[in-house]
């Protein structure tokens, strides 16, 4: 069972809160609740961030396109959170400028300027510059007829690491985090919940009592509630799939593009992992198991068609190096198009008189996870009659206790001059000040141990097994890092054999 707890922590016989789901919302609630003194147990049926939370567009943003649907409250709330998250996690969240090529037949310039003015002013903005108009010169990667555009600010995030670092923060406050652990049954016993958990690697089952239950199962929220908890969801849900592709880098520069399309949708093109471009997303109604969600050929062609309509360089399906799809469970607000469905969240409370409460989390954006978690924890503390004060707005995530990324990189270079520049930059952007913990005792590159390919060494593999709930190569290659884009199949096979031994040793040490 993937279980990492704070040093010296003893399991509680009755937890205040059992959280089902190890995505960003579940981990956010675990962090906030544990930090307020509640005893927290979180279970995740797979790896942390294994589904929707690692399959986003990887943006911390207000959502410029939501202004067209008059979702001003959502945009303002998200823009305010953008400022907080940039401050709390500067290692994994960084400013990103977006260029919006002007296509006069799609939206007039006055409409775009008005939207950007609102975007600049719906919430207080300190960390990022405002919007401006652009003239696109002959060096632009866009087609020659696109000569005008606009530029504005948002932020990029390593979404999976955001989840994992939030889980680490929760564990540091006493939360118990169990991965590869499914909730296979839960029922009320008066003012308590009794839940049966199953370790998916060993088949072992255990019973746990809690005073409250949080269903943060993401796209499985309704299935879990109906088939495992045997309660009805009070709000109709809509599953919407968003897909992305990764291609070789389309253009130099650290800015992104937001492309308008004839169907009134937009598509992002975002610099990704130095050598690649991330293109997305789609909005498609989805039915079936969210775990099986994958991009369709039609979605791939759609994304490439939008890009090819704007860029000089033309892409083919053979250029796609990687693709992924995530499914969101949104509260169904009866909008006809999936793109128009609100991304705002709903906290659904179920508490029959005299019985233990349950909160189900519906919808939400990765940008507003901290605010969602704060509101959910406010509810939990009220239900459990625990005095509490919100605290996470001023709390740096693990590794984020520094002000300037450039200064941190320079400091790390002085301390570890033997570290290759590419590896130092990756450690800086992935671990921040936790790099010191990762490299403790290392004096040379040889001290990092076995080399598995790209810039992956045994020292990092062991660190992630011990500190970040890594059990399978996929956890490491696609969520804790994106080195899956760089390691060859033979190298992955060697890594798998090594990790199989090391994870078994680690499990034996913790049993």
Model-derived features with residue positions:
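Glycine-rich FAD pyrophosphate-binding loop
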Residues: 34-54
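Glycine-rich Rossmann-fold phosphate-binding loop(s) that bind the pyrophosphate
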Residues: 22-23, 45
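C-terminal catalytic lobe of FAD-dependent flavoproteins
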Residues: 153, 159-161, 169, 229, ...
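Flavin (primarily FAD) binding-site architecture
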Residues: 215-230
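Helical element adjacent to the flavin cofactor pocket in flavoenzyme catalytic cores
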Residues: 150-207, 211
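Short hydrophobic core segments
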Residues: 20, 208-218
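Dinucleotide-binding Rossmann-like beta1-alpha1 core, especially the glycine-rich loop
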Residues: 58-139
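Extreme N-terminal leader/targeting segments of oxidoreductases
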Residues: 1-17, 32-36
């Amino acid at each position: 069972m993937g279980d990492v707890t704070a040093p010296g922590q003893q399991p509680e016989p009755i937890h205040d809160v059992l959280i089902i789901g190890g995505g960003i919302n579940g981990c956010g609630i675990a962090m906030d609740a544990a930090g307020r003194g509640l005893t927290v147990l979180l279970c995740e049926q797979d790896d942390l961030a294994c589904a929707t939370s690692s399959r986003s567009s990887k943006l911390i943003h207000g959502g410029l396109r939501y202004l067209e649907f008059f979702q001003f409250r959502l945009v303002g709330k998200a823009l305010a959170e953008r400022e907080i998250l940039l401050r709390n996690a500067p290692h994994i969240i960084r400013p990103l400028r977006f260029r919006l090529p002007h296509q006069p037949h799609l939206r007039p310039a006055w409409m775009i300027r008005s939207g950007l003015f609102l975007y600049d002013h719906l919430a207080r903005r300190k960390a990022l510059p405002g919007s401006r108009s652009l003239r696109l010169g002959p060096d632009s990667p866009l087609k020659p007829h696109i000569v005008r555009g606009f530029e504005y600010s948002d932020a990029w995030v390593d979404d999976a690491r955001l989840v994992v670092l939030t889980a680490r923060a929760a564990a540091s406050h006493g939360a118990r985090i169990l991965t590869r652990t499914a909730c296979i049954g839960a029922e009320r016993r008066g003012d308590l919940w009794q839940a049966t958990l199953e370790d998916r690697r060993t088949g072992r089952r255990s019973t746990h009592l809690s005073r409250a239950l949080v269903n943060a199962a993401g796209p499985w929220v309704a299935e879990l509630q109906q088939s495992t908890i045997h309660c009805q969801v009070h709000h109709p849900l809509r599953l919407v799939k968003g897909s992305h592709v990764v291609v070789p880098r389309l253009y130099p520069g650290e800015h992104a593009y937001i492309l308008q399309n004839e169907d009134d949708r937009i598509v992002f093109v975002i610099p990704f992992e130095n050598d690649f471009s991330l293109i997305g997303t789609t909005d498609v109604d989805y039915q079936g198991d969210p775990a099986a969600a994958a991009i369709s050929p039609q979605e791939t062609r759609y994304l490439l068609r939008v890009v090819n309509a704007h860029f000089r360089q033309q892409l083919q399906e053979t250029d796609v190096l990687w693709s992924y799809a995530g499914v969101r469970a949104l509260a169904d607000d009866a909008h006809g198009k999936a793109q128009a469905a609100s991304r705002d969240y709903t906290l659904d409370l179920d508490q029959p008189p005299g019985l233990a409460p349950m909160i189900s989390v519906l919808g939400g954006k990765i940008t507003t996870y901290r605010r969602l978690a704060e509101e959910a924890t406010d509810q939990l503390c009220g239900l459990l009659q625990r005095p509490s004060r919100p605290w996470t707005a001023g709390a740096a995530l693990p590794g984020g206790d520094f002000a300037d990324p450039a200064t941190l990189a320079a400091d790390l270079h002085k301390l570890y001059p033997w570290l290759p520049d590419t590896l130092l930059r990756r450690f800086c952007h992935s671990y921040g000040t936790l790099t010191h913990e990762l490299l403790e005792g290392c004096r040379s590159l040889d001290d990092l141990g076995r080399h598995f390919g790209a810039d992956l060494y045994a020292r990092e593999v062991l660190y992630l097994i011990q500190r970040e709930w890594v059990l399978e190569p996929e956890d490491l290659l696609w969520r804790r890092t994106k080195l899956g884009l760089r390691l060859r199949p033979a190298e992955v096979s060697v890594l798998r054999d090594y990790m199989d031994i090391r994870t078994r040793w680690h499990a034996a040490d913790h049993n």
